[in-house]
Amino acid sequence: MTERRVPFSLLRGPSWDPFRDWYPHSRLFDQAFGLPRLPEEWSQWLGGSSWPGYVRPLPPAAIESPAVAAPAYSRALSRQLSSGVSEIRHTADRWRVSLDVNHFAPDELTVKTKDGVVEITGKHEERQDEHGYISRCFTRKYTLPPGVDPTQVSSSLSPEGTLTVEAPMPKLATQSNEITIPVTFESRAQLGGPEAAKSDETAAK
């Protein structure tokens, strides 16, 4: 089967900034596609768990102005706990996958289908920040339900950075339990054979 690249519609505005929720003094990446740092008390909690990301102490500016920093870090925590998480919805009419890719630019995402599988790829080219050089990539694969036409797969990217890939489910033929039985008319000649036919002719004379 040939490979097909799925174009996605861009719902983000021209002023979209992938770093809008990042703390201005720190732009580090972790294992969940690249995320901002967390407050000290959250860092201690996550450091004692199985959290895979890198964390560091709260910046001094945030300590001096906790009321200002709290909303930004609250949004950051929400994104960090959900970033990279995908959701699959399968109804009678549609099959849909939603994937959080809010830290990838549109030109860093690729969606394609091959052999009944949807493949989503994101890649950051190597870039430099105040901490050094960083690059990041990911690949997610999803098997299409049986009967789904790969050419009908579409995708869109929301302003919040959610990539949605969906396809219509095949329509099943409507089966009815009602059966109409035709009625066949048979004459006496057919019922009695040749002798019955002669008897009918004699009676007619």
Swiss-Prot record:
GO terms for molecular function: identical protein binding; protein folding chaperone; protein homodimerization activity; protein kinase binding; protein kinase C binding; protein kinase C inhibitor activity; RNA binding; RNA polymerase II-specific DNA-binding transcription factor binding. It comes from the Eukaryota. One of its GO terms (cellular component) is extracellular exosome. Its main location: cytoplasm. Changing residue 99 to M: In HMND3; decreased homooligomerization; decreased heterooligomerization with HSPB6; no effect on phosphorylation by MAPKAPK2; decreased function in chaperone-mediated protein folding. Residues 76-184 form the sHSP domain. InterPro entries: A-crystallin/Hsp20_dom (IPR002068), ACD_HspB1 (IPR037876), Alpha-crystallin/sHSP_animal (IPR001436), HSP20-like_chaperone (IPR008978). The keyword Chaperone applies. It is found in: Cytoplasm; Nucleus; Cytoplasm, Cytoskeleton, Spindle. Detected in all tissues tested: skeletal muscle, heart, aorta, large intestine, small intestine, stomach, esophagus, bladder, adrenal gland, thyroid, pancreas, testis, adipose tissue, kidney, liver, spleen, cerebral cortex, blood serum and cerebrospinal fluid. Highest levels are found in the heart and in tissues composed of striated and smooth muscle. Changing residue 34 to R: In HMND3; increased aggregation; increased homooligomerization; changed function in chaperone-mediated protein folding. The modification N6-acetyllysine is found at residue 123. The modification Omega-N-methylarginine is found at residue 12. Induction: Up-regulated in response to environmental stresses such as heat shock. Up-regulated by estrogen stimulation. Changing residue 39 to L: In HMND3 and CMT2F; increased aggregation; increased homooligomerization; decreased phosphorylation by MAPKAPK2; changed function in chaperone-mediated protein folding. Residues 70-205 are annotated as: Interaction with TGFB1I1. Homooligomer. Homodimer; becomes monomeric upon activation. Heterooligomer; with HSPB6. Associates with alpha- and beta-tubulin. Interacts with TGFB1I1. Interacts with CRYAB. Interacts with HSPB8. Interacts with HSPBAP1. Small heat shock protein which functions as a molecular chaperone probably maintaining denatured proteins in a folding-competent state. Plays a role in stress resistance and actin organization. Through its molecular chaperone activity may regulate numerous biological processes including the phosphorylation and the axonal transport of neurofilament proteins. PANTHER family: HEAT SHOCK PROTEIN BETA-1, HEAT SHOCK PROTEIN HSP-12.2-RELATED. Belongs to the small heat shock protein (HSP20) family. This is Heat shock protein beta-1. It comes from Homo sapiens.
